[in-house]
A protein has these predicted regions:
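Structured C-terminal subdomain patch of bacterial secreted/periplasmic proteins
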Residues: 51, 220-248, 326-404
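Flexible, glycine-rich surface segments
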Residues: 259-341
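C-terminal motif of bacterial Sec signal peptides marking the signal peptidase cleavage site
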Residues: 17-21
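A short, structured surface patch at a secondary-structure boundary
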Residues: 86-91, 96-182, 188-194
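Extracytoplasmic ligand-binding site segments that recognize negatively charged/polar headgroups
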Residues: 121, 128-139, 146-157, 197-200, ...
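Structural recognition of the beta-strand scaffold that forms the well-ordered cores
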Residues: 122-125, 142-147, 188-192, 212-215, ...
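Bacterial Sec-exported substrate-binding components of ABC uptake systems
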Residues: 2, 23-131, 242-269, 393-404
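Bacterial N-terminal signal peptides that target proteins for export
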Residues: 1-9
Length: 404
């Protein structure tokens, strides 16, 4: 602890120099209140579909036993080894070796494998979409530090923990409170991919001896793939059984929704960026999958991100107009730059919206800022979309509201 504390001053000086322009320039962080994939920095894919069937990594001194059973998630694997060791492989990023309490790190471990020593506790949570998963399997008491103030949480247990003092604000992802984390013996920082905008900050956290885990759940193409990350976090805390039980319940909810007959009505899901561009989801993202399950068709049928594997794509207004002007429904993603509550507010962002079919027909909806944190209840948004597509009872909706 003394060694870690002594390094804080030097690290904070480095941070000050970087912020003052004396270091390398980081990419823009976007809206710090959300860890949306819309502004994620990404790596090019280097793995193909065969990765899902690859053999478990061989680790000197460890004996492989089994692999976690996954149904929808494709962005990670968890391998189990004898004596309680586990290896988490996040395909877009790194591998993380979970070392059980009382055991030691294997000798000659590859330098690029991040070691997480159990018990996993005093966690810093900046990946806001993951907090609801911790709450769902009973692991929220292991989260001691938050990347949001109490007012920023829509997960009730997290908000209550902040207000009671059980959980403490320790700086947002880009401006960490290093001293608070060190004094509180932070054992793990769980970050969204927004941390990739500030690589120097991640390095400084790691230099303090705090392992950093980056959550890529937003890269999943199926809505339940994102929820299935609860199994990964269950493995971190040795709560696999509780995580499996919750996931099976959510999977059952989604399976029941698959009987919806498709209406063939088209839906565009988007938000307007601060630079005036339109940000939409690529076609194989989990949001278009939800629209399909709900009984609709995503307006952008074959949209890909040409530059990276990020789930969102920036379009010019002209590009968006060409496809979405005739869409039956527009859904404005209010989790990013705040809710747009009325048609007039939408048209103020760009007057061309007045020409859209959905605007003329009064079929424009928006999501609340709480949606991104609700990773544990994806079925509710699908139900909302189905009610929207079938002119159902709006009072039964959880996340969608109609623009007036």
């Amino acid at each position: 602890m003394k060694i870690r504390r002594c390094r804080i001053t030097a690290l904070m000086l480095s941070a000050a120099l970087l912020l003052g322009g004396c270091g390398s320039t980081a990419a823009s962080g976007g809206n710090s209140g959300n860890d949306s994939a819309g502004t994620d920095v990404t790596k090019d894919k280097t793995k193909d579909a065969a990765d899902k069937t690859k053999k478990a990594p061989e680790i000197e001194g460890l004996t492989y036993e089994s692999t976690m059973d996954l149904t929808y998630a494709t962005e990670f694997d968890v391998y189990y080894y004898k004596d309680g060791y586990k290896l988490i492989d996040v395909h877009e990023d790194k591998q993380y070796l979970i070392v059980p309490e009382g055991e030691e790190e294997p000798e000659n471990l590859a330098d690029d494998i991040v070691v997480i020593q159990q018990p996993t506790e005093n966690i810093y949570m900046a990946a806001t979409a993951s907090m609801s998963l911790f709450d769902a399997f009973g692991g929220i008491d292991k989260v001691k530090f938050s990347g949001l103030e109490a007012s920023g949480w829509y997960v009730e247990c997290a908000k209550e923990a902040m207000e009671s003092g059980a959980m403490t604000f320790a700086g947002k992802y880009s401006e960490p409170d290093y001293e608070t984390r060190v004094d509180g013996d932070c054992g793990l920082a769980i970050e969204s991919t927004m941390i990739l905008h500030t690589p120097k900050v991640q390095e400084m956290i790691e230099d303090l001896g705090i392992p950093v885990f980056v959550d890529y759940s937003s890269y999943e193409s199926h809505p339940l793939g994102r929820t299935e990350w609860i199994k990964l976090y269950g493995a971190l805390l040795n709560k696999e059984e509780e995580a499996d039980t919750f996931f099976d319940q959510q999977a059952h909810v989604i399976e029941e929704l698959k009987g919806f007959e498709n209406t063939e009505k088209t839906v565009a899901y988007f938000y307007v960026s601060t630079d005036g561009s339109i940000v939409v989801r690529k076609s194989d993202d989990y949001i278009p999958s939800m629209i399909e399950i709900a009984g609709g068709r995503y307006a952008f049928k074959d949209l890909k991100n040409p530059d990276s594997n990020a789930p969102s794509v920036k379009l010019t207004m002209e590009e968006f107009y060409a496809t979405a002007v005739d869409a039956d429904y527009l859904i404005y993603n209010g989790t990013i730059d705040g809710q747009v509550n009325s048609i007039s507010e939408l048209e103020a962002k760009n007057e061309l919206f007045s020409e859209f079919k959905a605007v003329k027909d009064g079929n424009v909806w928006y999501t609340g800022k709480n949606l991104y944190q609700a990773t544990d209840t994806v079925g509710e948004l699908i139900k909302d979309m189905h009610l929207m597509l079938t002119d159902g009872d709006e009072s039964q909706m959880t996340f969608l509201e109609k623009m007036e």
